[in-house]
Amino acid sequence: MTVITRFAPSPTGKLHIGNVRVALVNWLYAQKYNGNFILRIDDTDRDRSKVEYHEAIIKDLQWLGINWNSSFLQSIRFNKYKAAKQYLISSGRLYECYETPEMLEIERKRQLTSGYPPIYSRKALELTKAQKVQLQAEGYKVHYRFLIDRNKPIIWNDLIKGEIKYDGSNISDPIVIKEDGTMIYMLCSVIDDIEYRISHIIRGEDHITNTAIQIQMFEALGAAIPQLGHLSLIKSDSGKISKRIGGFTIDYLRDQLGIEPMAVNNLLALSGTSNNVDAYFSLESLITKFDLSAFSKSAIIYNENELVTLNHKLLVNTEYDTIKHRLTAIGLPDVTKEFWLAVRHNLNTLNDIKIWWQICYLPTLDKFQEQDAEFLKLAAGLLPSGKLTDNSWDDWVQNIIKATNRRGKALFMPLRLALTGITYGPELKYLLPLIGGEEVKARLLRHQ
């Protein structure tokens, strides 16, 4: 059997780390077993689906390195769904309903007030043909529900959570075709999964009830049921992550926070598993590590600091030749290999390099302790002559110690403030050659 997985986002908002984790896990599973990965755009919601969100989904997945063997829109397949609709009607698994949303809301409130779960009463099954004609004449529009078989339990062996059981009597018959004739994604999804021979459906645990319903849809259409797995959800400190909550979307991580794609991939592929979350440089490494059985049943708490730490580890170990084109893209084409090696240990994101470029070549040095003026003047006079190298710092410091007897913070902090304007950063021994001898002296003497 060829492994075929799919990712089926709705273009009604931006991708966030929760649904991208689903995409990544499905992609990794397909790659692990030399299978195929399909991107399906669930755009059946005509009112909320937007072209710009579809384009953003493509951009985000490509940025992460997640590619697909084929892709399609559900909206272009509505005609293909008609045959399944007629089959389910003729077999008695789809039935006509005429209640308005207001009528259904009244029924729901009545059930809750009486202490019953809000499960559809199936009153529409009692309608005669004449009553249906009368309702249509009065302006009521037909929609269709899928008839759940409530006489048998729904059971499957979940790839992540183990055996899951559902009592069909606790599930309301879902509306699958709206009044305007549009088929809702729940049934469309099953029809597509059958036609595209999806072998494994892996998605978030918030879809477990949908899965129970869709198992019966597969059976009603006479199709084999794919293997099913449900990932635990990613949560923030304040609760569930959503595409409508800022700070978790992929475009925010990329465009505002400046995170590397492999930092996102590492965090999402390894968090909540028995593997350590580490900074791997390639998706191929994650494919090797991937094991669906290693995923925990417990929810994951998203920590942005952990993502930034992974990002830092990646940058620290990135070679200059690999990053040079990216530096040009962010407006720093003149960054040399020496500069990159000097500052990369102090970068949390690639954009941080702009800070060090500013410090070395376009400084605004306003931090200065007046009591250190004489010390800095003396230090300027002891600076080695000629072109500064990585070894110049050690020679310079030894000369300063001999002349002033200053050591430790009393020696280093005035020099760092005078040369960079801040109290932290790359080792000064690496910054000196970048700043250059004349500029070093000028900064030391600027308040004389």
From Swiss-Prot:
Catalyzes the attachment of glutamate to tRNA(Glu) in a two-step reaction: glutamate is first activated by ATP to form Glu-AMP and then transferred to the acceptor end of tRNA(Glu). InterPro entries: aa-tRNA-synth_I_cd-bd, aa-tRNA-synth_I_codon-bd_sub2, aa-tRNA-synth_I_CS, aa_tRNA-synth_I_cd-bd_sf, Glu-tRNA-ligase_bac/mito, Glu/Gln-tRNA-synth, Glu/Gln-tRNA-synth_Ib_cat-dom, GluQ/Sye. A motif ('HIGH' region) lies at residues 9-19. This is Glutamate--tRNA ligase 2. Belongs to the class-I aminoacyl-tRNA synthetase family. Glutamate--tRNA ligase type 1 subfamily. GO terms for molecular function: ATP binding; glutamate-tRNA ligase activity; tRNA binding. Its main location: cytoplasm. ATP binds at K243. Gene3D superfamilies: 1.10.10.350, HUPs (3.40.50.620). Pfam families: Anticodon_2, tRNA-synt_1c. GO terms for cellular component: cytoplasm. Its EC number is 6.1.1.17. The keyword NAD does not apply. Monomer. It is found in: Cytoplasm. A motif ('KMSKS' region) lies at residues 240-244. Keywords: Aminoacyl-tRNA synthetase, ATP-binding, Cytoplasm, Ligase, Nucleotide-binding, Protein biosynthesis. It catalyses: tRNA(Glu) + L-glutamate + ATP = L-glutamyl-tRNA(Glu) + AMP + diphosphate. GO terms for biological process: glutamyl-tRNA aminoacylation.
